[in-house]
UniProtKB/Swiss-Prot annotation:
Source organism (scientific name): Shewanella sediminis (strain HAW-EB3)
Descriptive protein name: Flap endonuclease Xni
Enzyme Commission numbers on file: 3.1.-.-
CDD domains reported for this sequence: H3TH_53EXO, PIN_53EXO
UniProt GO BP: DNA replication, Okazaki fragment processing
Cofactor descriptive note: Binds 2 Mg(2+) per subunit. Only one magnesium ion has a direct interaction with the protein, the other interactions are indirect.
KW Metal-binding (keyword) present: yes
Gene it is expressed from: xni
Protein family: Belongs to the Xni family.
Binding residue positions for K(+): 172-173, 181, 183, 186
Keywords annotated in UniProt: DNA-binding, Endonuclease, Hydrolase, Magnesium, Metal-binding, Nuclease, Potassium
Length: 255
């Protein structure tokens, strides 16, 4: 079975860089990132490995909702400037890159989903909670910084909803980190209670007559925001990749 180690490049690099006291200090970053990738390969023993990077194009999510990820601190210029050299260094170490047009998340989700559909296995190295929605047991998530697999049970316990309700939950409660609006007036606690009672976003909106008048009014007024938020949260798993897996095969996975 092909096992593809898919590394979320900016998730890894920005967190490693954030540990530096001076954001303009990128000395040795290539060696540290290269060492991290080498450890990941040694531990997981994949047949293929790639680092997927965000691109410069405006995300389709930003076109859909202008406030998407609004207010996020921009990447330090020194870090941005060193990325080409970092990618070259990783390639010299046998770890090739995939450059997304905009957000890497959809490329990662598509690659993982297509691998599994063709009998493979994917290990996504990222702490991004958005990958929680990828439910196939042959798609695993690895937290490099805490050195453990992030399980469905762990995420369910943290959110208070079932794995299958993850997107519905964020469509209702929103996500402040990504500026996903959710339904105004429906916070995490209310979203959990609604999903425990009605099981899904569709069922909630089909049962407004069974919900208290005040809450039903909020839900009705925020229906379009719920739909928008659902679209923003949902990962695309069918975008064109135009890659050849042989580019990312490791010559000796046991090395």
């Amino acid at each position: 079975m092909n096992t593809f180690l898919i590394i979320d490049g900016m998730n890894l690099v920005r967190r490693m860089h954030a540990a530096q006291p001076n954001e303009n200090d990128v000395n040795g970053l290539d060696i540290r990132v290269g060492s991290a990738c080498k450890k990941l390969v040694k531990y997981h023993q994949p047949t293929h490995v790639a680092v997927v990077w965000d691109g410069d194009d405006i995300s389709w999510r930003k076109h859909l909702f202008e406030d998407y990820k609004k207010g996020r601190k921009p990447m330090p210029e020194a870090l941005s400037n060193t990325l080409p050299a970092l990618k070259s260094y990783l390639a010299e170490q046998g770890v090739n890159s995939i450059d997304a047009a905009s957000e890497a998340d959809d490329v990662i989700a598509t690659l993982a989903s297509k691998l599994v559909a063709n009998g493979g296995k994917a290990i996504i190295v990222s702490t991004d909670k958005g990958f929680t929605q990828l439910s196939d047991p042959y798609i695993q998530r690895w937290d490099h910084f805490n050195q453990h697999y992030m399980t469905i049970e762990e995420r369910e316990e943290k959110l208070g909803v079932e794995h299958s309700q993850f997107i519905d939950y964020l469509a209702l409660a929103g996500d402040s980190g990504n500026k996903i609006p959710g339904v105004p007036g429906i916070g995490p606690k209310s979203a959990i209670e609604l999903l425990r009672t009605f099981r899904s976003l569709a069922n909630i909106y089909a049962s407004l007559d069974k919900i208290g008048a005040k809450q039903a009014k909020k839900l009705e007024a925020g229906k379009q925001m719920a739909r928008l938020s659902y679209k923003l949260v949902q990962l695309q798993t069918d975008i064109p990749l135009n890659i050849n897996l042989s580019q990312f095969r490791l010559p000796n996975p046991n090395a």
